[in-house]
Amino acid sequence: MNINVTLIGQTVAFIIFVWFCMKFVWPPLMNAIEERQKRIADGLADADRAVKDLELAQAKATDQLKEAKATANEIIEQANKRKAQIVDEAKAEADAERAKIIAQGKAEIEAERNRVKEDLRKQVAALAIAGAEKILERSIDEAAHSDIVNKLVAEI
């Protein structure tokens, strides 16, 4: 192969071109590539962080939901206990009131019965006195006496 001036000139021009590219073109390209790599790496890191934050938020939301359900169940349980307590208290009050009313009614019935007995005793006594007066006013004969006693028995 022949080495001539043209080949040497082309080689020198190529070396100058490579040097020029290495000096002025290559560093900005490398900076742009490195910046892009950094942005991509930052974007991926942000995406990973966002995924972790999302998972953490979902876990926290799940925990809060479980806690809220537990609190709601506790409140419902307390309400049911309170309801049962109120119902029991109302039943006890109703039973006490019923017993009181029954006792009052029995006392009133007993008092009325005693009053009626007393009235009957007074009436029987009055009738007996009236019968005795009638018997004493009339002459004592067997037929009149029997008739008065029968009338008294019918009135009683």
Swiss-Prot record:
One of its GO terms (cellular component) is plasma membrane. Keywords: ATP synthesis, Cell inner membrane, Cell membrane, CF(0), Hydrogen ion transport, Ion transport, Membrane, Transmembrane, Transmembrane helix, Transport. The keyword Transmembrane helix applies. The chain crosses the membrane at residues 5-25. It is found in: Cell inner membrane. One of its GO terms (molecular function) is proton-transporting ATP synthase activity, rotational mechanism. It comes from the Bacteria. It is a single-pass membrane protein. Its main location: membrane. F(1)F(0) ATP synthase produces ATP from ADP in the presence of a proton or sodium gradient. F-type ATPases consist of two structural domains, F(1) containing the extramembraneous catalytic core and F(0) containing the membrane proton channel, linked together by a central stalk and a peripheral stalk. During catalysis, ATP synthesis in the catalytic domain of F(1) is coupled via a rotary mechanism of the central stalk subunits to proton translocation. Component of the F(0) channel, it forms part of the peripheral stalk, linking F(1) to F(0). F-type ATPases have 2 components, F(1) - the catalytic core - and F(0) - the membrane proton channel. F(1) has five subunits: alpha(3), beta(3), gamma(1), delta(1), epsilon(1). F(0) has three main subunits: a(1), b(2) and c(10-14). The alpha and beta chains form an alternating ring which encloses part of the gamma chain. F(1) is attached to F(0) by a central stalk formed by the gamma and epsilon chains, while a peripheral stalk is formed by the delta and b chains. Belongs to the ATPase B chain family. This is ATP synthase subunit b. It comes from Shewanella loihica (strain ATCC BAA-1088 / PV-4). The lineage of its organism: Bacteria, Pseudomonadati, Pseudomonadota, Gammaproteobacteria, Alteromonadales. The gene is atpF.
